Amino acid sequence: MSPASSWKRKRPSSSSAQASKKRRVYRPAVSRSLARREPLQVQDFVWDTDVAFNRGGGCYLLTSYARGSAENQRKTAETITYKVAVNLGCAISGTMQQYCISSRPVCWIVYDAAPTGSAVTPKDIFGYPEGLVNWPTTWKVARAVSHRFIVKRRWVFTMESNGSRFDRDYTNLPAAIPQSLPVLNKFAKQLGVRTEWKNAEGGDFGDIKSGALYLVMAPANGAVFVARGNVRVYFKSVGNQ
């Protein structure tokens, strides 16, 4: 009979055990819903004519999605706005070109948790006193409506005039070039604004039940201006139809 050492099962060597462990590959399961994620919808607001921002500023609705089947329309009674791209060229108004002035206009993206169905003004949001109407860099959301309005983004830019007009000949009268035509290129992401809609087909102030988003701009130091360009909003229709 062979010795006991010849018929006992031998333990695998450490090198073979390590090789078997290396061969084990674990792959995490990927949800089908994640693999087939739908692209975001896009709503474009094109300002191809002058949009004036006068004393006290202006407020424009960004979550303006009428009901329908197009890419820029909501398909359900609930939407989520994820991103906003602001691409605007601003120009100091002709009436202000005769003055030598430097100003700091402000642009905001503001969330409205409980819209009333009517258009909103910067005064409704910030509640500034009359003495600060030309100083938007000092504006804060009014305490009485702080539960309703939330500033998501805030950008300050520079606008200037050197007292010269565009229609004059300055061949022998050199003048310093001011920042009278500033460009506002901003991109806001991770907004996550959820909007609930009433049982209506439109996409205006009166069609929103809760969760609106506004673009607000205001001139500073009395230097009113106009703007042209494009504001693009990225959103998704969610929930039941």
From Swiss-Prot:
The keyword Transit peptide does not apply. One of its GO terms (molecular function) is DNA binding. GO terms for cellular component: host cell; host cell nucleus; T=1 icosahedral viral capsid. InterPro entries: Gemcoat_MSV (IPR000143), GV_A/BR1_coat (IPR000263), Viral_coat (IPR029053). This is Capsid protein. Keywords: Capsid protein, DNA-binding, Host nucleus, T=1 icosahedral capsid protein, Viral penetration into host nucleus, Virion, Virus entry into host cell. The keyword Metal-binding does not apply. It is found in: Virion; Host nucleus. Homomultimer. Interacts with the movement protein. Binds to single-stranded and double-stranded viral DNA. GO terms for biological process: symbiont entry into host cell; viral penetration into host nucleus. It holds the Pfam family Gemini_coat. Transmembrane segments: none annotated. Encapsidates the viral genome into characteristic twinned ('geminate') particles. Binds the genomic viral ssDNA and shuttles it into and out of the cell nucleus. Plays a role in protection of the genome from degradation, virus acquisition and transmission by insect vectors, infectivity, and systemic movement. The CP of monopartite geminiviruses is absolutely essential for virus movement. A motif (Bipartite nuclear localization signal) lies at residues 1-26. Belongs to the geminiviridae capsid protein family. Residues 1-30 are annotated as: Disordered.
